[in-house]
Amino acid sequence: MMRKQWREWCQRAVVIAVVGMLTLVTTVNAVRADVKLPNIFGNHMVLQQGQKNKVWGTAAAGEAVTVTIGDQSHQTKAEADGKWQVMLNALPVGGPHELTIKGQNEVKFTDVLVGEVWICSGQSNMQWSVNASNDPDLEKAAAKFPRLRMVNVPQVGTQEPQWNFNGQWQVCTPETVGGFSAVGYFFGRQLHLSLDVPIGLINNAWGGSACEAWVRRDLLAADEKYKPLLESWATREAQFAELSQAKDLNEDQKKTLNAMRGQMNGNHRPANIYNGVLKSHLGYGIRGAIWYQGESNAGRAYQYRDLFPLMIDSWRKEWGQGDFPFYWVQLADFKAEKSEPAESDWAELREAQTMTMDRLPNTGEAVIIDIGEGKDIHPKNKVDVGRRLARWALAKQYGVNIPYQSPRYKSAEVSGNKMVLTFDHVGGGWRPFDVAELRGFAIAGEDKKFVWAKAKILQDGKIEVWSDQVAAPAAVRYAWADNPVCNLFSVNGLPLTPFRTDTWPGVTVNNTR
């Protein structure tokens, strides 16, 4: 009997001890919260040279955190919510360095370089990989640039701000470059070759994305112009919430629910990409951003005149680096060619993009009206796209004396039955491509009926446009089509920016959602 009681007592003691140990471990774990950083910080990363760089993460509330790189050391304490951040002093070009973050634990990142960092953003033509572009075998074989670093940010659509993402920095090699943005890589490669400094590229593009998905929702709600767009989404969101809570759905309802779930998590819902993608690295030290997007907003081109500048301005304010350079790619030529002049939503979107240069400082546009493919929305020539973007950065940020801006319409005057046009950024003059005859011009009178026009380059660089069918011209358009046939370049090899001299309402003027 005594032996049985002794055995039971021992068993109870063991159970109590185990429970006590588990409680102690749980308590210790609750108190201990390791220092953590989002994956925008990691081995092989590039820090922006010549400016302060923010480093941030989480730890236990009140925990002391020390961040060290080179001869710099910065101390801080985690706030009540566990968040902390420090600002590194400006670093010169160089490396490799070690970045050490020490709290109750220690995190160490190695092979950290200091150079030039650029965001590569937009939709599918920015996301488009080296593997899917022209000559991927040759491009990958040559991609031996140990000081060029890349990181891909995955596509997550949500209304909840994301602190981290699943990705890491990689060194540019023939094995790693294939899955990276082709436009981003060719842009970065040109900077690297021209400047001989480390380059860091952050690719967060999402194919098919709409501009409003990259913008904070409260900013959209603050402007009446976007009320119809937000109301449309509010209706869908309410329908999704109701259907999600319903029971015993039939097959059609299940299909509808799945489709709506895709919309709720997708790349068109306002603020979805801002929260799910951009927020995870917003504030990381950068030089600037390149952008290739607009196809998904072409049906609302007039709205884009305000939406696109709003997005750029909001990014700049939240990044806290002032008006950092923001360069974009104008939409390429695409779709079937038209035999006669016609209205075009793609032309109106290009116009909205060009207008943004007048709205915001430190912006620029790479015109690629000669690079597109009529039957493919994803032209495979990404080398020239990257180079034209690089021209802007090299000339404006790095002081390289090269042509960078496409010729652009400035003014027009009527001279009899002709219109004489003046342009900026022509440089050394004009060069028609392929044939001497200037193609792509259309002219109309006050009746707004456009016909193809003849054009002649004058000695002072102006261009004279006319048609025997229009006795009293009122407007001229150039390359005003989804897929225009046009052939005018500056002698520097940059195509004339598509334009119109009129302000007549276009086909997208009333489209708001």
Which residues fall in each region the model found?
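Terminal low-complexity, poorly structured segments
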Residues: 2, 18-20, 33
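Bacterial Sec-dependent signal peptides at the C-terminal "C-region" and cleavage site
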Residues: 24-34
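N-terminal secretory signal peptides that target proteins for export/translocation
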Residues: 1-11
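Cell-envelope and extracellular/periplasmic
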Residues: 32-513
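Generic detector of low-complexity/intrinsically disordered segments
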Residues: 8, 24-26, 101
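Bacterial N-terminal signal peptides
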Residues: 13-26
